[in-house]
Every structure is written in structure tokens, then in C-alpha cells.
Amino acid sequence: MSILPFPADAAGATHRQPNSRMCFACGLENPVGLQLSFYDDRAGSVVAETVIPAHFQGYPGRTHGGVVAAMLDEIVGRTAMTEDPNRFMVTAKLDVRYRRPIPVGEKLRLQGSLIRRKGRLAWAHAELRLADGSLGAEADATLMDIDSSVGDPAALGWRVYPDRSGEGEGG
């Protein structure tokens, strides 16, 4: 998988979020996962950039729709972590709209925004943008808090890993 350095135009999203060891979406030690890194502005917005390798394709040259849904699911969940990186939530509902085919081998940008919170619930929106800036897919999600025994940071290997660009651990 091609890993891109932190996007310079992230509009204030400079706080690197933690990753886990083996999560499919963010596990940096998962050899068959997406290995996504996320940055937030500590106020509800999260960004990530990546290039999807060909082994995640469905139709030739196109990212499998399930992989697209997984990326959108991960970033909506991370919007709830912008104020507390150890606040784990699960997706209760994910409404994905595929707007155009998502190519493999090209730069993609994920953006997520926390819409609101109420008690144990949160609502978020995410977009996946293609290299030309066009909208490839989007999702709206309802999230809910999980039991702290399930989301134990130590058991997940949850920590801020150094940037792959070699610039350190971020903020």
C-alpha cells in the first residue's frame, strides 16, 4: 500500500490520531489492512489520504465497494474521538452513497465531520474525494458508545505511531 505523508492542506487538522496494531482500517501492523492514518482538528473534523492498492479492487481498476464502506465507517467513528482519543464508538447505522467508481492506485482523500452528540449517541458525515476533488462516495452514520471493556486502549495497541514521513509523532 502506498502511504502518503500528512496532507498539507488539511485546514487545521494537525493532531495525529492514535492507531491500533491490527484493525483492518487503521492497524499499522496489519499486513492485509488499509493502514490508514488520521488527523483531526480537535473540534470534530478528521482527514486521511491514501492510495488503494490493486489487491483491494472489485472490478478491474476499481476499489471494492466494501472497502470504500470500511474507510467511510472508520472516519465517521474517528470524528467522535476528536475531543477524547479514548472514546470508542461503534456504528449503529451507516448510509453509504456511491457517487462514482473509486479507482485503485490513485490518491484519495477522506474527510469526516461530527454533526452532533446526544447522550451515548453521535451523528457524523464522511466524504471520499478523488484526486481531482470530485465526490466519489459519502456516508452518514449514527454512532453509539461501547462498553469500556471492549474498547480498552491497551488491549487494542492504541497509540500514536510516528508519521511514516519520518517527521515524528505529531501533536
Where are these regions (language model features)?
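Hydrophobic beta-strand-centered segment that forms part of the acyl-chain substrate-binding groove
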Residues: 75-109, 114
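A generic structural signal for short beta-strands and their flanking turns/coil linkers
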Residues: 19-20, 32-34, 44-46, 88-94, ...
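A conserved, well-ordered hydrophobic junction motif at loop->secondary-structure transitions
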Residues: 47-71
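Non-catalytic linker/capping segments at the edges of enzyme domains
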Residues: 1-55, 156-159, 163-171
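Residue-level recognition of well-ordered beta-strand positions that form the cores
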Residues: 49-51, 95-97, 111-113, 127, ...
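Short beta-strand micro-motifs enriched in acidic
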Residues: 39-41, 113-117
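HotDog/MaoC-like acyl-thioester-processing domains
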Residues: 1-14, 102-104, 115-171
